[in-house]
Amino acid sequence: IQQYRNSAESGKKKAISAEFCCVCEKNIVPLQRKFKGNILMLIGRKNESQVLLEALNADEAQFVAVYGRRRVGKTFLIRETLRDHFVFQHSGVANSPKHIQLQAWQESLTEAGLPVEPLRNWMDAFAALKRLVKNSRKKKKVIFLDELPWMDTQASYFLPALEHFWNSWASARNDLMLVVCGSATSWIIRKVIQNHGGLHNRVTTKIHLRPFTLLECEEYTQYKHLNFTRKQITEAYMIMGGVPYYWSCLQASLSMAQNIDSLFFSPEGKLCDEYSALYASLYKQPANYIRVIEALATKQTGLTR
């Protein structure tokens, strides 16, 4: 907050977040998107975008893991930075068994230009992916697997198939970049980044995508033409944090209080069910965690043993 206050007191133009906006005494002129060569700049995501581009330009195969809480903008960052290099992109299906996951994978292969017969297992799925990559004429080939934890269903042997794909073939190619992503942060860390099996030390780049800072939230409101005062922006930050999706739901025609009421407390509000959805995205059995939070909420000073 002190950094936020200091930006208002300065009478000089200065760079904030290294090229994302110019801050003046009374005005912020944000540049939410601009191109520098072929580099797409995003509010609050320059460092992460640059890390992805450095991995893209590496001389050897890259295994990139991007993780962070729900709605923080992981998929948006990856697509906006790397979309021109995708040869295959796929997203897991929430709360669905193995055969549904494989059917969705088959559909993604078809959309990418490789019609295949129904897949029996994950080994077949990754074998088909190999054929797709081999057929691509792109100089750099990016495979983007979104919501990876959802694919790892019970007794599906998804992880062993992924390990085999990377260790036996993908890691030997200098034109390949595998990007995996998921909102279940604990799963990504435990099963991929800190894996003690076939994926041990295989991740070459990891990105923990965090919410916007308070200053970045102001930049976003200026870009969206939301004429809120700094007091209102600070209040919204105390309520919603810096989660980009939540800020994208704000409407310029409503006051901040009206926005919050409409989003969170209206039965039809976009974020009315976010509480339960957030826990469901983080944990396979969210009910226990929700009960803990609800128990703590009954006491003003919390609970002790």
Name each model feature, range by range.
Residues 1-305:
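Phosphate-binding site recognition
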